[in-house]
């Protein structure tokens, strides 16, 4: 048994680094080389709990990278080493230190609290730069885009940042009862654990290369003059700045879509969250009125007219029906007085037609009646034309028994037959004239014979 135990121990010793390397496959690139020497069971449990609590959402392409065994880190993330002299310490120290506008309030964070806070912040890759940068600075938005614009998405980054900042803002407001001296001492002790958190920010890619749209609207007045109380709520600031401009409908991007409520048991934090949500909703509700006031102000010359719904009106169209069977009417020239009367009658007819347009049902019925009468007249005209062709065909000796003779043949044969009849008529009239002359001559000769015999 001792021999078997001695054989099994080197196997476990050799397999331990492999397991450690396998667990660290999805961590940052700059820590893969040194992570197996510092990781322990507590660290593994910490990251496992962090993934269970959804503080760091997994990237959508994480399964693909596991399949191909690649690292899902686009640019280098900032270093996590702690130091003493870093510009990032100034931002965090000033954010948690008492200000002049606060009524003697200050931070009550001890050294252990600062360590716990930093470990939580260092746990999420997308919060490293966004929390430490100045909210009024452009790098506050750029750093989120640098780290997660291609992997975790904007909505996950905005949600995580807003949750972190809302929780620390509530903790800062709860700590306003302590003295400012203690706040300064705590901030001075916290400087030992904050350094180089933004040291690698200059090595990252410029977000303008990755993201073609403008990051923030520098022309909006509300985003530039943000108050200290809303300095830690970038989602509400972005919403208010996007709603402040009157023509903010084609806004290119709003990084923080909504402010999620914090998961805390304190009633004060819930009330503060409700107040923040109410401010955003009231601002959204008041934006149409502000837009209407800004559109009606004379200073803006390019205000849009109010959009009126399209009203379709059906008017009466006078259609003159021509009876083709009727003989052509001769045009008469009316005198000036009669012409004026006719013009006035036409105007009255147009007015009556315009009045009829107000009732669409009556106009529909009138149009249907006119269409029906037009169809009846057209049918009658075609029937009469067909009967006339049949009668003409019956008069022609060559086409008398041909029922399927086309109309063109009927017309040609009819013209030829008419010309022949006219020629016969001329011959007969000439013969008649000759016979009349002959009769006159015979009568005259008969009278001469009677006179001579008497």
Curated annotation (Swiss-Prot):
Glycosylation, residue list: 73
Residue(s) carrying N6-acetyllysine: 159, 164, 173, 290, 332, 338, 386
Tissue expression: Expressed in the intestinal epithelium (at protein level).
Transcription as UniProt keyword: yes
Domain bHLH: 369-421
Subunit details: Efficient DNA binding requires dimerization with another bHLH protein. Binds DNA as a heterodimer with MAX. Interacts with TAF1C and SPAG9. Interacts with PARP10. Interacts with KDM5A and KDM5B. Interacts (when phosphorylated at Thr-73 and Ser-77) with FBXW7. Interacts with PIM2. Interacts with RIOX1. The heterodimer MYC:MAX interacts with ABI1; the interaction may enhance MYC:MAX transcriptional activity. Interacts with TRIM6. Interacts with NPM1; the binary complex is recruited to the promoter of MYC target genes and enhances their transcription.
Residues with the Phosphothreonine modification: 23, 73, 330
Comp. bias (Acidic residues): 266-278
Biased composition (Polar residues): 350-362
Miscellaneous notes: Alternative translation initiation from an upstream, in-frame non-ATG (CTG) codon or a downstream ATG start site results in the production of 2 isoforms with distinct N-termini, shown in this entry as isoforms 2/3 and isoform 1, respectively.
SUPFAM superfamilies, per database record: HLH, helix-loop-helix DNA-binding domain
Function: Transcription factor that binds DNA in a non-specific manner, yet also specifically recognizes the core sequence 5'-CAC[GA]TG-3'. Activates the transcription of growth-related genes. Binds to the VEGFA promoter, promoting VEGFA production and subsequent sprouting angiogenesis. Regulator of somatic reprogramming, controls self-renewal of embryonic stem cells. Functions with TAF6L to activate target gene expression through RNA polymerase II pause release.
Alphabetic keyword roster: Acetylation, Activator, Chromosome, Cytoplasm, DNA-binding, Glycoprotein, Isopeptide bond, Nucleus, Phosphoprotein, Proto-oncogene, Transcription, Transcription regulation, Ubl conjugation
Residue positions where Phosphoserine is found in the record: 77, 86, 97, 167, 175, 177, 308, 329, 344, 359, 362-363
Protein name as annotated: Myc proto-oncogene protein
Pfam family, one: Myc-LZ
Motif stretch (9aaTAD): 116-124
Source organism: Mus musculus
Effect of residue 73 to A: Does not affect interaction with TRIM6
Highest taxon listed in the record's lineage: Eukaryota
Taxonomic lineage of the native organism: Eukaryota, Metazoa, Chordata, Craniata, Vertebrata
Bias type Basic and acidic residues, positions: 281-293, 330-346
The record's note on its domains: The 9aaTAD motif is a transactivation domain present in a large number of yeast and animal transcription factors.
Protein location: Nucleus, Nucleoplasm; Nucleus, Nucleolus; Nucleus; Cytoplasm
Cross-link Glycyl lysine isopeptide (Lys-Gly) (interchain with G-Cter in SUMO2) placement: 67, 159, 164, 313
Effect of residue 77 to A: Does not affect interaction with TRIM6
GO BP of this protein: acinar cell proliferation; B cell apoptotic process; branching involved in ureteric bud morphogenesis; cell population proliferation; cellular response to hypoxia; cellular response to interferon-alpha; cellular response to UV; cellular response to xenobiotic stimulus
